């Protein structure tokens, strides 16, 4: 089990590195970002973003219940589960999908028709490419997970 978690952590770190490298973030930058444990713990208590830049976002996500169907036109979600279990449905078609108010690249809907279900639990890594419908269902709270959102920036 320890090997599985170690492998999952390595995959998450490699994904973060690839996301940053693909957006030129290994060039000279003004400074590194440090987030202390107090800030991270507080973010998970509410479920909120930790870092948001033009090339990537890192969220401390918390789910207490199932969510709506979502499509991120530009963001690929790289998810690492810290605690709890949930089923995520991906693919298929969004039922009653609408563009989220104030955005042009975020779609929300009631559910997903014809998708594939995957059970997620502690230590799992799950990647949802941009443009792929996804919805969390059957959530056992609290479901805590990091999401690294690698932004496509419109390059397709």
Model-derived segments and their meaning:
Residues 5-8, 20-74, 156:
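A short, N-terminal "cap"/entry segment at the start of jelly-roll beta-barrel domains
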Residues 60, 88-90, 145:
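Short hydrophobic/aromatic-rich beta-strand segments that constitute the beta-sheet cores
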Residues 70, 77-80, 117-118, 125-126:
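His/acidic/aromatic-lined binding-pocket segments of jelly-roll/cupin-type domains
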Residues 141-156:
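A short hydrophobic beta-strand segment most commonly corresponding to one strand
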């Amino acid at each position: 089990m320890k090997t599985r978690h170690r492998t999952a952590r390595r995959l998450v770190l490699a994904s973060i590195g690839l996301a940053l490298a693909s957006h030129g973030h290994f060039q000279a930058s003004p400074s590194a970002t440090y987030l202390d444990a107090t800030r991270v713990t507080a973010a998970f208590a509410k479920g909120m973003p930790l870092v948001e830049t033009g090339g990537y976002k890192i969220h401390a996500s918390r789910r207490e219940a199932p969510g709506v169907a979502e499509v991120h036109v530009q963001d690929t979600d790289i998810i690492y589960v810290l605690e709890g279990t949930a089923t995520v449905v991906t693919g298929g078609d969004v039922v009653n999908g609408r563009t989220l108010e104030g955005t042009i690249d975020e779609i929300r809907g009631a559910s997903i028709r014809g998708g594939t279900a995957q059970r997620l639990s502690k230590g799992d890594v799950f990647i949802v490419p941009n443009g792929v419908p996804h919805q969390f269902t059957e959530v056992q709270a609290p479901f805590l997970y990091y999401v690294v959102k690698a932004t496509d920036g419109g390059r397709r």
